[in-house]
Amino acid sequence: MKKLSGWQKVGLFAGVGCFSIIAIAVVGFAIAVAYARSTLANLGDTTPKRVERSIALPGTTAEAPDPTVKPGTAKSGAETTSGGPMKLALELQEGTFVIKPGAAGSRVEVEGEFSEALYTLTEQTDTVGGSTRTTVRFRSKAPAWARMLAGVGNGDDNRPRLTVSIPTGVPIDLSLNVSMGESRIDLGGLTLSELGLDLAMGNHEVDFKEPVAGGMERFRLNARMGNVSVENLGNARAKSIDTSGSMGNVTADLGGEWRQGSEAELSFTQSMGEVRLSVPTKVRLEADVRDSNGKHESRGADADQTTDPKAPLLRVRVSTSMGESRVTRY
């Protein structure tokens, strides 16, 4: 048998070494997955089960809803005993979430499927500055590394799914935080005075399918590490809209039923992502757009814009860095 040359020996040893490293990595990964699944199993039954929860909003008095009142036009179903809006905070992590308007009344309804061994759903009521605040939290009990490794090969079958129904007819200051998941949010028809949305690490769809009741003073949206779309923003009827984001794209349709004769200030600030706005011609627009290249564009009325002096006036400011911005009319 011919002896191997020096370079051949080096090549042989290198090949054996690479194969050994790959084999060790595969075996190590398999052991890590098995250990992660064992860790989760020690917490209890990891099979998702149906869960339903009804959470009362303190400080409200329930009334029978008035069937003659159209959603988004007047308050019905419940009112606060303190005379001011209720403060409701939803903090949702790691799942697929649907937030929508519920029946008139004084209760937040939560339903969905998840393993109570792996996730926890809690509620808490505090008094802050003389106002009552109810906080609903959904989060994981298990370590992040264990959930990630144990989910290898399982698809989305065990992913938590939760639907939260917010009662109509109750004046609410709403704070909604969704992270490490996906959400479909419809807040149309609710009675909102202030709204704060913090959406991170996932794709999120926000809609106002019906006008909110009363008049919202301020709508704040913060988006990070994900894509966010907003539909029918005019139905929010907010006097001030402040949107900021990073590492993702924001798409907003400014259609909807803005109040006749109203004026609104809208600000969109984005870094490492795009901002795309669609504005109907039935509203008056004053746009100040600045992109990452320092290009500045001021837009006023165009040929198709309404000439009605009582049409809603939107003052829009857009600023992007490391991304593009676009404002289109329809």
Label each PLM-derived region with a short phrase:
Residues 2-120, 142-171, 186, 204-205, ...:
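Short acidic/polar N-terminal linker immediately downstream of export determinants
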Residues 80-84, 129, 167-172, 190-192, ...:
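Edge/loop elements at the starts and ends of beta-strands within beta-rich repeat scaffolds
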Residues 92, 127-129, 270, 320:
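Generic beta-strand structural signal
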Residues 125-138, 158, 168, 197:
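Glycine- and small hydrophobic-enriched segments that form the cores of compact globular domains
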Residues 175-214:
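Right-handed parallel beta-helix
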